[in-house]
């Protein structure tokens, strides 16, 4: 009998609840500000829409959603791979360090965004010191993923694990490329030490930004959530996954198509016409793997 260790999963679950409440409360405040613009000025500059919106989007995406994803990983991975974190003191230490650095990063993000310290790139507002922290704990999560896979007893990788791996690889690539920036003080000796400018400019900056912005949604709100559903839905419903082959087909379809669809954020802009067309076409094609996963889940519930 394997004795699983859920301490890290519980810590991330606590963070999910905390950041979810904070992020969604700010979202409600923003909704009221849109209806009643005078509410923008009740707390001075710190209560304006422009200060609160990055807090809401980052809080929900990278606070609430990522916490839940990490909690799911540290719970699901042990069970489907038939291995406990207790069996590896190294992986346990990595998991705990992952949580601590992650939590510190989110708290620092709240402070800096409230202060108006931002790169001004949507969903990538965090400045370069925090970007470095994000990279560190993302690498720690990667060590956890491949470390647990490396010591597993169950040789077959369940579909949920595939989705977690794709999330790690895709977000790592997207985040690194989009957040390539030059700290202005280190480069010129002038200005604030925390300020930076993007390594890209003009149309190129827009292309990289929305390649990231679109796929941050794909690989934070889609693939890991599907991973959670493919574990908990059969578990709670008592039904087998309707079609395991369909889950694999939808997985590869989603990975191939989603990465090309970011161009639909730049319609009628200065990016090349062929890229706008490709982004639009791939967005329509995306119906197939998306519905493939959705139909598989619905038929699983039907039994």
Name these PLM-found stretches:
Residues 3, 41-44, 199-202:
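Short hydrophobic/aromatic segments of transmembrane alpha-helices and their interfaces
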Residues 10-42, 46-83, 88-116, 128-149, ...:
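Hydrophobic cores of alpha-helical transmembrane segments in multi-pass integral membrane proteins
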Residues 187-190, 198-199, 266-278:
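Extracellular/periplasmic helix-loop-helix junctions in multi-pass membrane proteins
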């Amino acid at each position: 009998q394997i004795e699983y260790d859920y301490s890290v999963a519980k810590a991330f679950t606590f963070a999910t609840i905390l950041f979810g409440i904070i992020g969604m409360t700010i979202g409600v405040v923003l909704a009221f500000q849109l209806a009643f613009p005078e509410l923008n000025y009740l707390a001075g500059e710190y209560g304006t829409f422009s200060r609160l919106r990055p807090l809401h989007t980052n809080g929900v995406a990278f606070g609430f959603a990522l916490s839940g994803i990490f909690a799911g990983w540290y719970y699901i991975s042990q069970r489907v791979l038939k291995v406990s974190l207790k069996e590896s003191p190294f992986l346990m230490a990595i998991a705990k360090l992952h949580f601590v650095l992650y939590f510190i990063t989110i708290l620092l993000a709240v402070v800096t965004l409230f202060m108006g310290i931002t790169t001004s790139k949507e969903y990538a507002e965090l400045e370069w010191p925090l970007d470095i922290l994000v990279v560190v704990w993302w690498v720690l999560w990667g060590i956890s993923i491949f470390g647990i896979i490396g010591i597993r007893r169950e040789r077959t990788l369940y579909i949920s694990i595939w989705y977690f791996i794709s999330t790690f690889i895709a977000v790592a690539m997207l985040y690194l490329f989009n957040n390539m920036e030059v700290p202005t003080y280190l480069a010129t000796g002038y200005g604030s030490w925390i300020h930076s400018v993007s390594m890209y400019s003009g149309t190129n900056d827009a292309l990289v930004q929305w390649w990231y912005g679109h796929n941050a949604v794909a690989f934070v709100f889609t693939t890991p959530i599907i991973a959670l559903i493919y574990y908990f839905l059969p578990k709670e419903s008592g039904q087998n996954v309707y079609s395991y082959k369909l889950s694999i087909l939808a997985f590869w379809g989603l990975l191939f198509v989603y990465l090309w669809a970011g161009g639909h954020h730049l319609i009628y802009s200065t990016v090349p016409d062929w890229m706008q067309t490709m982004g639009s076409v791939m967005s329509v094609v995306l119906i197939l793997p998306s519905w493939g996963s959705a139909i598989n889940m619905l038929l699983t519930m039907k039994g």
